[in-house]
UniProtKB/Swiss-Prot annotation:
One of its GO terms (biological process) is cytochrome complex assembly. InterPro entries: Cyt_c_assembly (IPR002541), YpjD/HemX (IPR052372). Keywords: Cell membrane, Membrane, Porphyrin biosynthesis, Transmembrane, Transmembrane helix. This is Protein HemX. The chain crosses the membrane at residues 7-27, 38-58, 65-85, 93-113, 135-155, 188-208, 212-232, 248-268. It is a multi-pass membrane protein. The gene is hemX. Required for HemL synthesis.
């Protein structure tokens, strides 16, 4: 780890600079600063990829097992998605906001252990479990973007109701676009989370038996999946497009975060 630690440290430094430049562009709408922020973000993603690959080579498994590894991978997913947003949508605010989350997550990973406990690492590095965690992280990335779209919807809705015209309002996509983007992200996230839970249950029954089924993290994951599935049902069948739907989406993501970071309540996620 020491050999590539400089990559991790440099990544955090450049990521902080990129977020600060994006914040400056958010306040002053400076195109030169925006291009600099985007260039730094590309470098950050490349460094994260290099660090991730080096960890996989050194550890001999796909590094998404410990909380350090999953937070790092989650941050990598968010950076990658924000770059895709820049390419397809060219909406700068949609690049800035996900990377606030991504940077905070990456900084959190600094304070966590980097290597799984040797006694259980052989069990934890099974392909089934690695696929389970990877799908979960990609679904979290999709839900993160969906939450941001819904939060922007609520902000714009409030500004329009209050007739508060500002430069920020002009930089936001329309309400219909924001709602549509949130819907598409949830359409991506729900199947991935479903597959992740199914694979996790299969792995749990093989390794832990029946005792894990009443674990708080398992139950809360199923609740999160049910909430997002119901949200999609209302959006598709009832055509519910309103501020209440966006509020529900934001609250669902908060529950997702509680489930993800509230690892101490779980009886078998103790290796994190």
């Amino acid at each position: 780890m020491a050999e590539v630690r400089w990559i991790y440290d440099l990544t955090i430094f450049l990521y902080a600079a990129s977020v600060l430049f994006y914040f400056n562009d958010f306040l002053q709408s400076n195109r030169k600063v925006n291009r600099l922020a985007f260039g730094l973000l590309v470098v950050v993603w490349a460094l994260q990829t290099a660090f991730f690959v080096s960890q996989a080579v050194m550890k001999g498994y796909f590094p998404v097992i410990t909380l350090f590894e999953t937070l790092f991978f989650y941050s990598w997913v968010l950076v990658g998605l924000s770059l895709a947003i820049h390419y397809f949508f060219r909406i700068d605010l949609l690049v800035f906001l996900p990377n606030i989350i991504g940077f905070v997550v990456l900084v959190m990973s600094m304070f966590l252990p980097e290597t799984p406990i040797e006694a259980v690492s052989s069990i934890l590095t099974s392909e089934l479990l690695l696929t389970h965690v990877t799908l979960a992280m990609f679904s979290y990335g999709a839900f993160s973007l969906s939450m941001i779209f819904s939060a922007m919807y609520l902000l714009q809705h409030k500004m329009l109701k209050g007739r508060r015209w500002s430069p920020l309002l002009r930089r936001l996509p329309s309400l219909d676009q924001l709602e549509g983007y949130a819907y598409r992200m949830n359409m991506l996230g729900v199947p991935m989370l479903l597959l992740s839970i199914v694979l996790g249950i299969i792995w749990g029954k093989m390794v832990l038996g029946e005792k894990f089924l009443l674990d708080s993290k398992v139950l809360l994951s199923e609740l999160v999946l049910a909430i997002y599935s119901l949200w999609l049902y209302q959006r598709y069948r009832i055509r519910c497009r309103c501020a209440d739907s966006s509020q529900w989406n934001v609250l669902a993501f908060l529950l997702l975060l509680i489930n993800f970071l509230g690892f101490t309540t779980s009886t078998f996620h103790d290796w994190w």
